Amino acid sequence: MPAGDLDPVPDDGHRHELPDGTLIMSPAPGLPHQVAAAILCHALELACPEDLVAFLSAGMELGVPGAVGPDAVVARRSGTRLIMPPLLVAEVLPPDSGQPDLNHKKAAYERFGVPSYWLIDPDRERPSLRAFRLVAGKYQETAHAAGDVPFRVEQPFPVEIVPSRLVAKLRTR
């Protein structure tokens, strides 16, 4: 199913994506998901060099077929469209852990040639970040941190993020 086929899909409060030509419908992201994505994106934007930009929910079309909406993206600054693979896509795990959904999307990012893929678990007690790097067409895990342990990577640019800060505003006091 080509990405353009999503155009007639109603705005029913669900996310509709085509990571490998198969329609995946999931509930709209909840507050923990959106807060973690927004704080992550802000941290990325503060750390990224001038020639790059970090942004939320790109709704990118990744080749033929395939449309996915990563939670955060880092790409080179250019015109109004993303015509080459971004340097980084980040996905926040849904509450149901959506593993089939993430496997489809991860495979789509691999095929599209996205060099860096991050996975965020917004668990309030022990949030975590995992980084994957594209090597010979497949992702290999390169970094992992949880809780208050700093997550450090050098690609696509040096950045340090403490996973617990992604959900700090969600914790009850």
Question: Where are these predicted regions, by residue range?
Answer:
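Gly/Pro/Ser/Thr-rich low-complexity, intrinsically disordered segments predominantly at protein N-termini
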Residues: M1-R173
